Amino acid sequence: LDIARRIQEGLFPKTPPQTPGYDIAGWSKPADQTGGDYYDWIALPHGRVAVMLGDVTGHGIGPALLMAICRAYTRATFPTQTELQDAMRRLNALLSEDVGEGRFITFAVAVLDPASGEVE
């Protein structure tokens, strides 16, 4: 479990995004050695940044693995989509195939445009 915890900790972002006029940070401390907590930020075209926050139901290795899958799909999906709704639909479709019955992922995303101050 200690190895799984270190791997999971390595999946969280190491440095904050460069967002002039804004400070973005994150920190997570799971109740057990591993868990399903998720936060991330991804640089998008035109200086925008997507900030994500999620939680997989449960504690332990299973939710930690689903969190890692969620992170991988998110990082693969968001930079390729120009519209937030399209990215969320694609992410939902991918995750729906992998999340077993009785499990779910709560997920929220905000897209910040530091130049205009708009949040979507």
Regions found by a protein language model. Give the residues of each.
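… and, occasionally, acidic/histidine-rich disordered N-termini of signaling adaptors
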Residues: 1-120
